[in-house]
């Protein structure tokens, strides 16, 4: 019984540690813009969308930064792709 609890706790911790953070990208591969720095309802809403799986979002450096994103969510900078597709 104790072993089962320890294994479950480890799996939960691994899932938390492996969640990724980063800037959201738009369709052109650029950071999603925001203008109200710090706590930002728009960024928080965008990060928590079901298909992104983020836990929290805020505006940092005029871009929406998300914590706890799923691995499948693309973040800026995209590998081998520049902002604007060039």
Swiss-Prot record:
InterPro entries: LCN-type_CS_alpha_beta_dom (IPR044062), Scorpion_toxin-like (IPR003614), Scorpion_toxin-like_sf (IPR036574), Scorpion_toxinL (IPR018218), Scorpion_toxinL/defensin (IPR002061)
Keywords: Disulfide bond, Ion channel impairing toxin, Neurotoxin, Secreted, Signal, Toxin, Voltage-gated sodium channel impairing toxin
GO BP field: defense response
GO cellular component: extracellular region
Disulfide bonds: 30-83, 34-59, 43-64, 47-66
Gene Ontology MF: a single term: toxin activity
Protein family per UniProt: Belongs to the long (4 C-C) scorpion toxin superfamily. Sodium channel inhibitor family. Beta subfamily.
Domain note: Has the structural arrangement of an alpha-helix connected to antiparallel beta-sheets by disulfide bonds (CS-alpha/beta).
Function of the protein: Beta toxins bind voltage-independently at site-4 of sodium channels (Nav) and shift the voltage of activation toward more negative potentials thereby affecting sodium channel activation and promoting spontaneous and repetitive firing.
Name this protein carries in UniProt: Toxin CngtIV
Organism: Centruroides noxius
